[in-house]
């Protein structure tokens, strides 16, 4: 009888531990979405462990860009450096890219992957871009920071 009670307590204790662990899994798996004062949103999908990208650094990235659907999901892919097999390089914070990129890539570490959700005001705005990006489009980019030169 005493042994049965001990086994039941052990099993109950293990069940509590398992349930607690399962409840924490979604929290650990979902990265926190950050919204900046400008309206840019980003999620670090992978935090790198290399140099930190700062304004005026020359950075090398791979990226894929999508139009955002009305429900917030990724829509049509419109560009990808990965598809071309050619990383994209630019001077960070110098206005060589859309504002959402200048803001969103800063603070990344080499090896990191960040999803940027860029509102129209930080992207191509009312004009759109080259018939590929419509006016007032919200853009989603997945950016991998490959290298930084200070």
What are the language-model segments listed below?
Residues 2-150:
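Cross-family detector of peptidyl-prolyl cis-trans isomerase
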């Amino acid at each position: 009888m005493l042994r049965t009670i001990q086994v039941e307590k052990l099993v109950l204790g293990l069940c509590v531990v398992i349930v607690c662990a399962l409840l924490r899994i979604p929290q650990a798996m979902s990265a926190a979405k950050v919204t900046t004062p400008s309206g840019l949103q980003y999620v670090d999908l992978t935090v790198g462990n290399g140099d930190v990208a700062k304004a005026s650094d020359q950075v090398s990235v791979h990226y894929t860009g999508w139009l955002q659907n009305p429900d917030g999901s990724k829509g049509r892919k419109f560009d990808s450096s990965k598809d071309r097999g050619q990383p994209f390089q630019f001077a960070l914070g110098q206005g060589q890219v859309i504002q959402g990129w200048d803001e969103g890539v800063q603070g990344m570490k080499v090896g990191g992957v960040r999803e940027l959700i860029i509102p129209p005001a930080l992207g191509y705005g009312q004009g759109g871009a080259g018939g590929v990006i419509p006016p007032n489009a919200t853009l989603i980019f997945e950016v991998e920071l490959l290298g930084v030169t200070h």
